[in-house]
Amino acid sequence: MISLHNFKRQHNAINEELSFLETEIQKEKVLIDISDIIFHIGKLTALLRIHLLEENTNLYPELLSSQDEGVRSLANQFIMEMGELINEYTIFKCTYSEKRINEKMDDFLKDAEQVLKAMKARFTKEENELYHVLTAVA
């Protein structure tokens, strides 16, 4: 059986980074610390890699081996959705270097708001839907 403690701890760390970035992009443009944003995007990326590795190694294999077709279907849905979201995040992360943010601040702020909102929604959905199923299956 899978312990949700580590996944929830990872979510907390990821949400801290998302919240920091959300707060930073809400500042007046002249007050935004681009170096700090780049640092926290890197930190978020590392946390996401660890989280996804653990999900793909431990969480999803258990859910996909469930006797319950609904559980397997839900797991497949979450795998597909996360794949799409990670692709969007990767494009965002690779698009915006420090130089590019300076050159295209308005585009960066718009894209960052969209990506951060989608990420927060995803992790809330995991906790509210996926983790409840895992608890019920246990």
Residue ranges and their predicted role:
Residues 1-138:
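Small-residue-biased structural context
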